[in-house]
């Protein structure tokens, strides 16, 4: 678990909640409690202790430069201990955030220099049978339509992740 004050920039996808619910029904330990379905644009982001107004302005500006998008989630991805659903339509915004803050290594470098845009469904699925069960349950829910409407900067507090601010995609009105 990361330390309090860790931040992330994400796109929350409320319509994808059933994917996490399916994994939770198989094993609640596989789903991070209190973390909604989302695509991480940059994690970890600038630590809260050194986060500046300029960083926040840059997040808002970059979010405004991308339109809101209707998404079709179709493909389950599995790696050892990990089940996700790919979201290739959001790769350009993920890449833009990585480019804007090129000194930050996504996921601390654990998944390479350019991790694919995805919704994490289950983490810690080290038992291959459990991972297969999650993959099958999630696969039955796809395809799933959702909409990316805003970017959110979140901060880890002692009691879990909390939003710091939300910036609409496509400008002030989210168009």
Which residue stretches match the model-derived regions?
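Short, exposed beta-strand-loop hairpins at the edges of beta-sheets
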Residues: 153-157
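Basic, often amphipathic N-terminal segments
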Residues: 1-70, 87-149, 161-175
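Short strand-connecting beta-turns/loops that link adjacent beta-strands
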Residues: 78, 158-159
